[in-house]
């Protein structure tokens, strides 16, 4: 369960080289940190020790995290919190033409996409996950064969991509699969 009792994504892990050192730095930057959890206007990020590829014992996954979506209502505060305070690299800030502003922050191999729909003082919230697949048609077929409801593949908003939406109610997190066109 998410904060406030809502179902869905409760927190996302951020791999860092030094959890205590990073936590102390984020406190100095004015963020709310309790132990290894950083809270940004209702969104919880858990600091975890980064591991090298050699330390990971599981086989490679056909899916890798492409981006985490955060919905926000104040673009200036979001830029300050996710960029200057948390230290993510703001790569793109634009009006999407779809009724919201998109702010894209680089975070390791993934992106934190902050979607700003309107100004206000509502708390931020996780809006979903997008997973990258080198072979989206095969991944979609695998999921459908496993009984997961997945939309047809369609053109993505980012040029050169295709996407499919996972519509599994048990997942409770809006989920998108992204692949090359």
Question: What is each PLM-predicted segment?
Answer:
Residues 1-10, 157, 164:
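Conserved donor-binding loop and adjoining core beta-sheet/short helix segment
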Residues 5-16, 46-79, 85, 126-131:
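N-terminal beta-strand motif that seeds the catalytic metal site of vicinal oxygen chelate
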Residues 20-64, 94, 98-116, 144-181:
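Vicinal oxygen chelate
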Residues 26, 78-83, 143:
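Conserved active-site tyrosine of GNAT-family acetyltransferases
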Residues 103-132, 139-140:
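Acidic/His-leaning functional-site neighborhoods
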